[in-house]
């Protein structure tokens, strides 16, 4: 058998042909911009988190008396341990930044619209899994903020009628955050990334069923090129830029995105003066505390994800991309500003005037999803595909 025939035979194997179909010969719109590179970048972030997490787990001890010291052991005694920890800790923030940009790009260009509803729903599930994974990963360092963050967040389940207290006891594995809680969170944090991998593969498969959206928001099977080598090279530019950005945080500001109280061993006796979650939880924290009643605040979190899930089913857009919808553009930038304001409010102390100001951004956030279908019905716009007009 010649070398050429051997290569062809290899590509015909089930696994190789699947990889070739989805990663090499996948037909891609030729006008994709750099904003479409955040999907592959998110995959790289996930791989970084899994690899660094596995190596960190080799040196970590999930016990309340040893957890904090084992983290310090990684930092001081393990060769390259400081790099592993800073890559993992800052990598979580980089992962969330990339995914946020990926989500907002989809909102701007309406990538969630028909026939890609299932792609969007899977994306929301992935986002929810990421939040749970990040929260379970915040507890294992067993610093002061880790302990009290776990105590406060898990206590929110007590707002659920009838079964709330039972759920809290089950989460804790006892009557307070202790060794059982630490072991449960560490185990879940080790498991969830692999579930994320499976959900991401389903997300990719669902996307490739109908193909990628593009900046124009129209579909054409004529103006497409293979993913390799064109978009590999284009994505490579984004990967290099991300590597530089990531390296700056690792080597020059590794602790900026963390909290100094987490360098104090967990102590259930003194309460920190201001319990602040990680930056990626701040918008949810702001929505939670915008309603004075505990049950109302917890109930306000669920609609955030329900709105994101329901958005693809608003059958109202003749024009998909916001490039041709100036009204929707304004609403989108208002949502982005509101998201930043939620993050700022979430890190402020619970006192005037922040409490009053904090009740406005959640209202604007939910208003966005309520009025999104309206601008989509203004104007006929461009056809859904280049061939629509010729087929009529």
From Swiss-Prot:
Binding-site residues for heme b b566, renumbered to this chain: 102, 203
Residues noted as binding a ubiquinone in the record, renumbered to the chain: 208
Entry binding sites for heme b b562: 88, 189
GO biological process assignments: mitochondrial electron transport, ubiquinol to cytochrome c
InterPro entries according to UniProt: Cyt_b/b6_C (IPR005798), Cyt_b/b6_C_sf (IPR036150), Cyt_b/b6_N (IPR005797), Cytb/b6-like_sf (IPR027387), Cytochrome_b (IPR030689), Cytochrome_b_C_euk/bac (IPR048260), Cytochrome_b_N_euk/bac (IPR048259), Di-haem_cyt_TM (IPR016174)
Localization of this protein: Mitochondrion inner membrane
Regions crossing the membrane: 38-58, 82-104, 119-139, 185-205, 231-251, 295-315, 327-347, 354-373
SUPFAM superfamilies: a domain/subunit of cytochrome bc1 complex (Ubiquinol-cytochrome c reductase), Transmembrane di-heme cytochromes
Keywords linked to the UniProt accession: Electron transport, Heme, Iron, Membrane, Metal-binding, Mitochondrion, Mitochondrion inner membrane, Respiratory chain, Transmembrane, Transmembrane helix, Transport, Ubiquinone
Domain of life: Eukaryota
GO cellular component terms given for this protein: mitochondrial inner membrane; respiratory chain complex III
Bilayer topology: Multi-pass membrane protein
Main location class: mitochondrion
Sequence similarity: Belongs to the cytochrome b family.
Note: Heme 1 (or BL or b562) is low-potential and absorbs at about 562 nm, and heme 2 (or BH or b566) is high-potential and absorbs at about 566 nm.
Protein name, UniProt field: Cytochrome b
Originating gene: MT-CYB
